[in-house]
Structure formats: C-alpha cells, structure tokens
Amino acid sequence: MNWEQLLSLRRQGDRSKRLRKEQDETRLGFEVDYDRIIFSGPFRSLQDKTQVVPLPINVSSRHNFVHTRLTHSLEVSVVGRSLGRSVGKGILERHPHLNTIHGYTFNDFGAIVAAAALAHDIGNPPFGHSGEKAIGRFFHDGAGQQYKSAMTASEFQDLVDFEGNANGFKLLTETKDGVTGGLRLSYGTLGAFMKYPKGSLPKKPSKHIADKKFGYFQSDKSFFLEVVEELGLLPNPHNLEDGFLRHPLTYLVEAADD
C-alpha cells in the first residue's frame, strides 16, 4: 500500500482526479467529510442511543447525565484528530514527498481520522450489540426465516449476523432522496472508517472477535470494491476469498475509541 492512494480525495461520482494541492486551505477536503457527517440525519439520531447510563452519585445532583452515542462519537473524534495529527507528522518525515510534491500536511491525517471516528458508531442499531443480536435472531430462528429462499447465502448471512459496521458503510454511501452516493465522503475517509473490510461469508472458525465481523452488505459490495481498488488495499493473506487488510489509519480510529 502507498500513501498517495490511501489519502485519496476522490468521491463517488467524480469524473476527474482531485489533487491535494488544488484544495482550499481554509477548508480541507477531508474536513468537508467531517462537516457532512455531523450535519447528517443518521449522525443526529445517535443522540437517542445510549452509550453509558452512569450510576448516580447523588440522585438529586444536576450533574447526572446519560452518555449518548452522539456524545461518545464527538469525544472519540477529538481524540482521533490528535492521534492523526501526531502520526501524520511522523509519516511526513518518513515520506516528505507527500508534502513537497502532493501538498499533504499533518492536518490531513487528523481530519481523516476525526471524520472516520465521528462516524464509527453511526450504523449501530438501538441497544447496540444487543440490537444486532436481536435482528440476527429474528432471521436465524424467527419469522425472518421466510425470506431466506429469496436471497443468496451471503445476503441472508448479512442479516443473520447483522453488523453495525456494515450498516454504517451503507448509511454513509447509500443513494437516496435523489442524492447519488449518500454523503459522498472521500475514499480516504471511507477507508479509515472500514474496520472490517470483508463480507459476512466465508465465515472463519475462530474465537477472535474480528473474524466474526464484516464491513459491508452484499447490496453495497460493488462500491466497497471500488473504494478498495482506489485506495490500493491489499488482500488479507488470512482471508484470501473475501477480505482485505485495513487502511492504516483505521487503527487510530480504533485506538481513539478505546
């Protein structure tokens, strides 16, 4: 993988290449991603999803509050921006041509990580992982089984193992209301967002949590592969059939979430 590809400013529907040197320095291309996410309906809906309900120290205290997914996402994005800028400085020192030839600065790295971190929970259903399991059970051994015959094995597996990360990719990229490509985020930001760049099948027999998760639904596979190709993500040697190695900045998004 190379950073020129990994930092792609391309957006769905683009007909010409976006160059970093041509970007407006007062509002970086990757900062536009952050703005589009924070003003989106799916992000605003996170205010109704609980991240943590703290035990009250004092029942009558005005300082008691519910920590929502929206608040959590804002906090993670702030940490992610700092991590991205710090790591970005080191990357530019090792690869100075990214700045001298292409015009990238350490702020670009911070902006990518901040935007991806802001969206990291955007696809989570109500009740988080419990909600994912409830949806999965509905299709695995509930009334949802009636739809199995109308789907491919992979399509049905997407529902049996319903995954918030895949749903997030769908929300960010799905064409609706006449808007092609959803939020039309840069491919660099989408790459950093994709924690699990693989499909729901084949399933790898493993106890490792990452092997049980996936990053896209079958309905979004063609665009997922377009992003992968643009970024130059490499096939995962441990899952050659349907998986790719992560975008390096994804690790910073995950670190910010810990």
Residue ranges with predicted function:
Residues 1-26, 34, 38-49, 74, ...:
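Sequence-structural signature of the catalytic-core scaffold of metal-dependent phosphohydrolases
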Residues 50-64:
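A short small-residue
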Residues 63-66, 246:
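Active-site oxyanion-binding pockets that recognize sulfate/phosphate
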